[in-house]
Amino acid sequence: MNIVVVGLSHKTASVDIREKVAFAPTQMEKPLRALLAIEDIAEAVIVSTCNRVEVYISTRDIAGGMARIKRFLADYHGISPEILEPHLYAHHGEAAIRHVFRVASSLDSMVVGEPQILGQIKTAYGYAAEFKTSGIILNRFLHKAFSVAKRVRTETKIASSAVSVSFAAVELARKIFGNLSDKTVMLIGAGEMCELAAKHFINNGVRGVMVTNRTYERAVKLAEEFEGKPVSFDDLFDQLHKADIVLSSTGATQFIIKPKDVEEVIRRRKLKPMFFIDIAVPRDIDPKVNDVENVYLYDMDDLQGVVASNLQQRAEEAKKAEAIIDEEIGQFHKWLSNLEVTPTIVALRSKFEETRKAELEKTLASWKDLPPDGAKRLEALTTAIVNKLLHPPTATLKRVGQGGRTDLYVDALRTLFELQTGESEAEELGELEE
Amino acid sequence: MNALFFKLTLAIYFAATIAYLAYLVKPREVLGKVSCWILSAGFVAHCAYTVDRYLEAGHTPITNLHESLSFFSLAVVGIYILFERKYRIFILGSFVTPVAFLLMAASTGFPSAIMPLNPALKSKWLMVHTVMAFLSYAAFSVAFGAAIMYLIQQHFLKSKKLGPMYQKLPSLDILDEINYRCLTIGFPLLTFAIISGAIWAESAWGTYWSWDPKETWSLITWFVYAALLHGRLTTGWRGKKAAILAIVGFFVLLFTFLGVNLFLSGLHSYK
């Protein structure tokens, strides 16, 4: 049995293609059942997010399986195969395992280390489990992918740092203030970036919001949105000491906040720290403000510098993650191969055993002057012959099972000895292995 | 028996220091917990050593430099473990544990034989005065560790060069709070130690205060910390200023403890 992955992602397809191929997350039953109805597809899982659409199947026929998924994707969404084909990637065997482990660990994501993808795959797997389109192989495979992703998360620092400007600002605030729940944010100006950053702060537990703007109406409107307090622009320096975090993005052409103002404000605050974030270009806050004691000023470039160094750190952590994945692929591949090899060995052994027993019985039934311990001796002799003969092929199969090219040997043996090729044994075995 | 406990403590503190430094390099929760357990085991061994010595000598074992350094170290570890339980900041241990280990190691450099007590030291005040003094020293040592961490973290935030160390260090707020907590524990203890010392001096030598070098330096130390506490409570000194003063205070304290003993002669100089 093989694992085959066919799909497309932000790396291979533009958003207009991805949109067309996406599956509605609430209506997974129909496509999953349709996939399972296709011949030679034993199990199926569909992962569909805004950045990727992937189909995982288990099948005996690798090439056929790939072609059938491709056709299914085109037919299901009514896109001509010629248009879709160039955007699709297809993996099987070890490459498929590596691919899914990397996706689940967020190494293949647009922002490496972003945590959402794991949840999305879990949801996708949830549908497959609900509609019973995944079986022992994909079950085991995806559970393994989840545990690999968890290992990557706990053993590397791949997701430990903020990679967007807004999150970097929140992270910095945490390093300054610790808990944000009793902190107040002041928004100066009402730019879009400022709003976004303010939202991040609110989502991260900031208590109070104050908004000021040159046009007071705009401040009132925005303050309502955040359930905050509007402050008239003229009162800015009267109110500033109440803010712990100041987000500024006005269209002013000159500095509106100078070191002298901040020194005064910080004195009124009894030296309680302040964090200024200047998102405006040109800047609103004099860079010298950073020199005031207990005041921290970050402008857009500073924040982007933080993000860049975090991204670089993630890239370094990604290398460690790849090493973890390498390790885990080996283990899973071994299981998959054994899954293939073991039933064949079992079938081969039982075939030999049945033949031996049948022939022995025939002989014993017709042998009149058998010595008293003759039956016992013949039993031992025939068993020994069978075991001796079966030893080399069993050992060889176990060995290739760990290397690759398993199918070749398994198919040859099954044909040569006319072994049963039922799924039931494999399933039983799989359950035992679970 | 006594020597065994001592060696055991020294060995475990060494292991704890290594473990905490490893935590500094690779801050894993498990490593932090293991470090804390090792240190706690060392603390138990250290208590055993101290109690054993107390029983053998028949008085609180803080009468020579060997014993004092050992007791200082014990107090540092004890106070640190309390902070560890409250704040769960293992990285603080990376800064404090080496101090405890060094104090313990330094104590090996001084004669450890139990000597008969000088008559003036034979007093119930010996225990009260010295234990208070060393507990306050320990609190100030933890404050020293937190202050150094504060300055490092603040440097990262101000300079905007956020290295890997920045990720590992706790927030400025927590470090400042630890600094303050230590002060509120250490200062009353120091005050009480000085007062009990004065009472003892009166009963031993008939005078509360004789401007002996140790007394003078104790007063200086007290003033430094009093200024820090006053600044914090009234003008809101915090952050960098508080951290620097905690560091200055610690060096004054070290001089009061060691410098006076080693370089200046007086009633407190252990022979």
Curated annotation (Swiss-Prot), chain A:
<dbReference type="InterPro" id="IPR036291">
    <property type="entry name" value="NAD(P)-bd_dom_sf"/>
</dbReference>
<keyword id="KW-0521">NADP</keyword>
<dbReference type="GO" id="GO:0050661">
    <property type="term" value="F:NADP binding"/>
</dbReference>
<dbReference type="InterPro" id="IPR015895">
    <property type="entry name" value="4pyrrol_synth_GluRdtase_N"/>
</dbReference>
<comment type="similarity">
    <text>Belongs to the glutamyl-tRNA reductase family.</text>
</comment>
<feature type="binding site">
    <location>
        <begin position="114"/>
        <end position="116"/>
    </location>
    <ligand>
        <name>substrate</name>
    </ligand>
</feature>
<comment type="function">
    <text>Catalyzes the NADPH-dependent reduction of glutamyl-tRNA(Glu) to glutamate 1-semialdehyde (GSA).</text>
</comment>
<keyword id="KW-0560">Oxidoreductase</keyword>
<dbReference type="InterPro" id="IPR006151">
    <property type="entry name" value="Shikm_DH/Glu-tRNA_Rdtase"/>
</dbReference>
<dbReference type="InterPro" id="IPR000343">
    <property type="entry name" value="4pyrrol_synth_GluRdtase"/>
</dbReference>
<comment type="pathway">
    <text>Porphyrin-containing compound metabolism; protoporphyrin-IX biosynthesis; 5-aminolevulinate from L-glutamyl-tRNA(Glu): step 1/2.</text>
</comment>
<dbReference type="InterPro" id="IPR015896">
    <property type="entry name" value="4pyrrol_synth_GluRdtase_dimer"/>
</dbReference>
<protein>
    <recommendedName>
        <fullName>Glutamyl-tRNA reductase</fullName>
        <ecNumber>1.2.1.70</ecNumber>
    </recommendedName>
</protein>
<feature type="site" description="Important for activity">
    <location>
        <position position="99"/>
    </location>
</feature>
<feature type="binding site">
    <location>
        <position position="120"/>
    </location>
    <ligand>
        <name>substrate</name>
    </ligand>
</feature>
<dbReference type="Pfam" id="PF00745">
    <property type="entry name" value="GlutR_dimer"/>
</dbReference>
<keyword id="KW-0627">Porphyrin biosynthesis</keyword>
<feature type="binding site">
    <location>
        <position position="109"/>
    </location>
    <ligand>
        <name>substrate</name>
    </ligand>
</feature>
<dbReference type="Pfam" id="PF01488">
    <property type="entry name" value="Shikimate_DH"/>
</dbReference>
<feature type="binding site">
    <location>
        <begin position="49"/>
        <end position="52"/>
    </location>
    <ligand>
        <name>substrate</name>
    </ligand>
</feature>
<comment type="subunit">
    <text>Homodimer.</text>
</comment>
<dbReference type="GO" id="GO:0019353">
    <property type="term" value="P:protoporphyrinogen IX biosynthetic process from glutamate"/>
</dbReference>
<feature type="active site" description="Nucleophile">
    <location>
        <position position="50"/>
    </location>
</feature>
<dbReference type="InterPro" id="IPR036343">
    <property type="entry name" value="GluRdtase_N_sf"/>
</dbReference>
<dbReference type="InterPro" id="IPR018214">
    <property type="entry name" value="GluRdtase_CS"/>
</dbReference>
<feature type="binding site">
    <location>
        <begin position="189"/>
        <end position="194"/>
    </location>
    <ligand>
        <name>NADP(+)</name>
    </ligand>
</feature>
<dbReference type="Pfam" id="PF05201">
    <property type="entry name" value="GlutR_N"/>
</dbReference>
<dbReference type="InterPro" id="IPR036453">
    <property type="entry name" value="GluRdtase_dimer_dom_sf"/>
</dbReference>
<dbReference type="GO" id="GO:0008883">
    <property type="term" value="F:glutamyl-tRNA reductase activity"/>
</dbReference>
